[in-house]
Amino acid sequence: MTDLTSLTIAEARAKLSDKEITAVELTDAYLAAIEAANETINAYIAVTPDKAREMAKASDARIGAGKAGALEGIPLGIKDLFGTQGLHTQACSHILDGFRPHYESTVTQNLWNDGAVMLGKLNMDEFAMGSSNETSYYGPVKNPWRAKESNLDLVPGGSSGGSAAAVAARLCAGATATDTGGSIRQPAAFTGTVGIKPTYGRCSRWGVIAFASSLDQAGPIARDVRDAAILLKSMASVDPKDTTSVDLPVPDYEAAIGQSIKGMRIGIPKEYRVEGMPEEIEALWQQGVAWLKDAGAEIVDISLPHTKYALPAYYIVAPAEASSNLARYDGVRYGLRVDGKDIVDMYEKTRAAGFGQEVKRRIMIGTYVLSAGYYDAYYLRAQKVRTLIKRDFELAFHAGVDAILTPATPSSAFGIADEDLASDPVKMYLNDIFTVTVNMAGLPGIAVPGGLDHKGLPLGLQLIGKPFDEETLFKTAHVIEQAAGRFTPSKWW
């Protein structure tokens, strides 16, 4: 019998339905894989074996009774940003030590309602602030990929590094993730997995620990495009508890896979050809263009003139919202508390001890740009730039473009504790250069593996779609996936 952890969600669903395997067997296979690998990969920060087996048993009973849900018996990993009732939920921060919420996030509740099984909570950058999963209080995640003839540990990307690494290393069938400026798409590109950031409002943010509320959006990371479509169908919903969630029917995304893209117009934005971009990224982009052309799509050059302002504007808007959102962590009601001589001293000591360096940096930036003397010069101007970025996309789509193709990242995965990046945070921020525009405009974006670089590391392509048109992204990404093939790392752990 094949290793159960090698099954995609679609394959496992079929075998469970045909009663070739049981949910308990599948769950035990993943729990064994986690036990063997997690000490090395560090993808999970909390494993929930008892809960997983209990859920799997209930799934087997429902399958036996002919009442199987859409994800019945499928074992998933959950990013530590999602509130899971009575279970570890800390956003991988010291300040939330011991926090176990009394509520379940809407997205995870949707998954459990469809019969999914929870394996545990996944590592991530602290409060989702980072591009390499090195800011976690629980230590860095190791990318399951290594360069050819190298034993150097690489980052899996961030902030959803645990989600991407767990999917790539087959430590879960699929994972939840969140994306504020690229935190689903960049890790997916670094690990040879598929990640989709849906349109802002497609998935409820209720019960998800907030970073930047106008940018955050939940989505799945999966092994292939079909699995991502299956997961998003279950995750997405309107939610009266989240006023930013949109009351639109959730389509059957899986049905879009395999549909023809003949006659579709794919935009290629000239502004994404950034200075110093490696030749391999340009070659991958051209290869993506060729694949879509071969499938009958029409390629059109487009301009998104305000792209160059997206990164600086993002790094004003996101920290500003974060400084406000993170003001609630003060040691009074939950999490870490460091005693002080009075309440203000307690606040200061708790926050000094509880937040990591990158989180402190972003709170400081955010507080600065919101301060009386600088609000107009920074925050207000960044919001105006955001409107212009959104308008660029609207004009492109209005002119008849169906989707936009770009690289997902400016490079393949880099080393853990890279000295060059550690000494210059702005260099780390540049990892988001191709992804932040999508969040600023509230659009859907998907990262799909396009090939390997000369070191044998995965590179991803990104497709950007019209609001709430994730179906077009799935069918187009599937064309790229069919042409490029699927990529799995050689096991070294």
From Swiss-Prot:
Q: Which residues form the active site?
A: K79, S159, S183
Domain of life, per lineage: Bacteria
Cellular component (GO) terms are: glutamyl-tRNA(Gln) amidotransferase complex
Q: Which UniProt keywords apply?
A: ATP-binding, Ligase, Nucleotide-binding, Protein biosynthesis
GO MF annotation list: ATP binding; glutaminyl-tRNA synthase (glutamine-hydrolyzing) activity
Instruction: Identify the EC number(s).
Output: 6.3.5.7
One Pfam family per UniProt: Amidase
Asked whether the keyword Ligase is assigned, the reply is yes
**Task performed by this protein:** Allows the formation of correctly charged Gln-tRNA(Gln) through the transamidation of misacylated Glu-tRNA(Gln) in organisms which lack glutaminyl-tRNA synthetase. The reaction takes place in the presence of glutamine and ATP through an activated gamma-phospho-Glu-tRNA(Gln).
Quaternary structure, from the entry:
Heterotrimer of A, B and C subunits.
Entry's family note? Belongs to the amidase family. GatA subfamily.
Q: Under which name does UniProt file this protein?
A: Glutamyl-tRNA(Gln) amidotransferase subunit A
